[in-house]
């Protein structure tokens, strides 16, 4: 650490405990503030990574063949928390993060498939832009397959969560799902409505009832 950063760190530690109003040390602290190297402070703040940087870094770990499963899952968890923010979820397309995320649905490790479905569900929930992206990447068939046939129950549940989030109030996604559902899920001639929450709940509950 250079001398400017050292001075900044020392000042921040000294000022972490406020002095009493009539404490003579107060004068010293106020003077130290005046002497603070503002350039060092700017460098410290500018070095903080943006959410976009953190998202890309997390997905790089997820996609790294040499990363441990533990580190991949930690990265996935961090990624999921970041995309709870609507703007971050919408930036996934610009950052090129949808491709590796959808690919992770086919990972051999169940925990990775689960986290991929979880992240998709978080990204598309009440988010038309992300719902459109999911359609662009043709992920609805894969999610339905996981929901119906994955041998891991936790993967099935997260896939159902992702489907549920994808189709609510998004008619194109629901139309895509309806085309793929077995005949006993939809009445002949029925046109499901993406705004009909009860009907969507019924579909999701039926998927949950499929035996493992």
Swiss-Prot record:
Function: Functions as a nucleotide exchange factor (NEF) for Hsp70 chaperones which accelerates the release of ADP. Required for fully efficient Hsp70-mediated folding of proteins.
Statement: the UniProt record of this protein carries the keyword Translocase: no
Source taxon at top rank: Eukaryota
Localization, UniProt: Cytoplasm
A GO molecular function held by the record: adenyl-nucleotide exchange factor activity
Lineage, broadest ranks: Eukaryota, Fungi, Dikarya, Ascomycota, Pezizomycotina
Record-given protein name: Hsp70 nucleotide exchange factor FES1
Any one cellular-component term (Gene Ontology): endoplasmic reticulum
Keyword entries, A-Z: Cytoplasm, Repeat, Translation regulation
PANTHER family from the UniProt entry: HSP70-BINDING PROTEIN 1, PROTEIN FOLDING REGULATOR
Coiled coil stretches, renumbered: none
Organism: Coccidioides immitis (strain RS)
